[in-house]
């Protein structure tokens, strides 16, 4: 199967701080992959490095075979990459629907507003509500929905289940499975292991800015002792 993302010997810095040390992993087209690890392990920095949002990067980041380690962020986005940061970045003075209308089409095949409302009925009900009046769960749905509007097919999702009610987490899990069926490639950073476990095809565990363990979904049960040791799950 063709690779959507191939990372080799990736190093990244914030100023003088050397955060990522020779990170190596790949994601096939249509796969869901989860980066696991404790806070500070380098998972979010990995997503930011893929998008060109860290200060300095070295090594190789290939997206659909194209080298991007020296590309600016806007060009990376135009390769069909969507990034949903942990902070959500909802425009609070705009309505939910106005937020949805903001993203530019980067690639053909982005979801229509009606498609989004079918996937997230809550947003349809709250379409005229200001961003500040949306619940945390509704804001998270909106943040994910915006990148689905762009036509991006490689999605980088940072802690999308964090701090949300179980019913919202369930909605997001259904969304991931639906997107997977539609051929999207997804890289998730997740602290919520119960959320990620049934969704991902493969798992990479990070520690101190490196990949220290990797395994496929069928190996999950056999790896629980290792995960407990590394993550405390």
Can you annotate each of these PLM segments?
Residues 55, 67-88, 113, 125-129, ...:
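ABC ATPase NBD coupling module
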Residues 147-148:
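ABC ATPase C-loop
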